[in-house]
């Protein structure tokens, strides 16, 4: 196992998850309209989840003898705050995190069971989140998955 590449990937995951915390917090502040309360609650839950994911990645970094990053992943302010725009941006962000977890899995497969199980668990969580957002982007009665 290339420990330095694993540490770099874990730090990138941590940065992406922390960017998600900022992103979801911002989105929660920008929701207006009749459905504001449940949507804000959902966005705040995602911010809390992102912080937990960042902490988990950071713990792995330190367990491996590395130094957790103070950086943040990319933050794109589109100035679009329609719920549909927020969900599409969320889907894109989650896809980037999912790719990073798959990259980690490829690096540690059959070399470190703890990191492999961590990566698999996070992949399952990210896929479930993408599926949830995908359903939210569908029109009422639409059963086919949303495609951009």
Place the predicted regions along the sequence by residue.
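Iron-associated oxidoreductase/ferritin-like identity signal
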Residues: 1-148
